[in-house]
Curated annotation (Swiss-Prot):
Source organism: Sphingopyxis alaskensis (strain DSM 13593 / LMG 18877 / RB2256) (Sphingomonas alaskensis)
Alphabetical UniProt keywords: Riboflavin biosynthesis, Transferase
Transmembrane residue ranges: none
GO molecular function annotation: 6,7-dimethyl-8-ribityllumazine synthase activity
HAMAP family: Lumazine_synth
GO cellular component: cytosol; riboflavin synthase complex
The name this protein goes by in its record: 6,7-dimethyl-8-ribityllumazine synthase
Length: 141
């Protein structure tokens, strides 16, 4: 079984609790172990994954957070740069499921975070496991 690190940006804690519930449920259902670390915001998620990868303790990673559009350009910066950082790590061979929601409003975030609705947390966990399986299929790991 895999050992998975969940990296969560807690800026919107009530929404992240929902995402985290979905991730943990998906991993527990498959019998995988997991740990969770918290970072201040979505921009810090890729750095935390990179640091954890250097430890060699984890097989896969799940990135969690919520970015809600506001009145400034900050939304674009955080959304684009966090996604770019995660993509760079995946291209370096890490198995990562990206569960950082980028939405227009809290209603959209609630629909996506709730595991009884869109369950984007659970989907991110399954994506990480799928990428780990692909690595194993290619004999990488």
């Amino acid at each position: 079984m895999a050992h998975v690190l969940i990296v969560e940006a807690r800026f919107y804690s009530h929404l992240n609790d929902m995402l985290l519930d979905g991730v943990r449920s998906a991993l527990d259902a498959e019998g995988h172990s997991h740990e969770t670390v918290t970072v201040p915001g979505a921009l810090e998620v890729p750095a935390a994954i990179a640091l954890a990868a250097d430890s060699g303790r984890f097989d896969a990673y799940v990135a969690l957070g919520v970015v809600i559009r506001g009145e400034t350009y900050h939304f674009e910066v955080v959304s684009n740069e966090s996604a770019r950082g995660i993509m760079a790590l995946t291209l370096d061979g890490l198995a990562i499921g990206n569960g950082i929601l980028t939405v227009e409003n809290e209603e959209q975030a609630l629909a996506r975070a709730d595991k009884t609705r869109k369950d984007k947390g659970g989907e991110a966990a399954k994506a990480a496991l799928a990428m780990l399986a692909l690595k194993e299929q290619f004999g990488i790991g």
